[in-house]
């Protein structure tokens, strides 16, 4: 029984790692920005999965990859919002379920490009190409 649980956890961890690397590669392809896995995420809470060596990078990115489902869990969004508030950056949740395309959740203020305080109770989900379009506009 323990071996089965350990194998499932290892496979799950590997699946998450592969997805993080896939997202980093896609962002590099689309935006020309190199992202790296934040190794602090494994040691302490309230860290995103992907970071940039550029301190002006405005996002905290959390990646979630699951077999079943179609909508992200509320605690995934809370996790990335908590990490983002600590470093005053924009929360980005990139998620994928088996046989479905990659989706991205961002706060609505990101889409509207609002300035000032952020109310992260409001958000939008979009496909990955739409996220890259908006990210290019934000970075310009």
Predicted regions and their residues:
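Catalytic phosphate/metal-binding cores of nucleic-acid and nucleotide-processing enzymes, i.e., regions
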Residues: 1-140
